[in-house]
Amino acid sequence: MTAAQDLARTRAETIAQIAALTAEFDEVVAASASSNADDEHDPEGATIAFERQQVAALLDQARRRLEDVDAALARTATGDYGRCADCGRPIAPERLAARPQARTCIDCAR
């Protein structure tokens, strides 16, 4: 599998994850709308608020990953993919296999 194919697969998986998390977030928001507005005295209120924050954080993380994957796809088009953005050395194939959207080598990432 080429780097572009691997990135395209990762992009599709990330888009699917964003869609699932968006649906889950919408469900949590709907549940919070039908719960007691007084979170302090509603035993489920705090749980719903926590779940809403957790899903929102996961959604934000997935959106950032999509931006990283799109940037990596752009680097494949320019021929810069697999080269560290900081030091210019090649990024180890093992790192790219684990994190295809990586823009830095292990040394620079530390």
Tell me the role of every PLM-derived stretch:
Residues I91-A92, R110:
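Short functional micro-motifs and their immediate structural scaffolds
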Residues A85-C87, D107:
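Short, cysteine/histidine-rich loop/knuckle motifs that typically chelate Zn2+
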Residues M1-T78:
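Interaction interfaces in information-processing and related assembly proteins
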Residues A77-D80, Q101:
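Short metal-coordination and nucleic-acid-contact micro-motifs, chiefly zinc-binding Cys/His arrays
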Residues R99-R110:
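Cysteine-rich micro-motifs
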Residues Q54, A85, P100:
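Solvent-exposed, flexible loop/coil residues
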Residues D70, E94-R99:
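Short Cys/His-rich "knuckle" micro-motifs
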Residues G82, E94, R103:
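Glycine-centered loop/turn positions within well-structured domains
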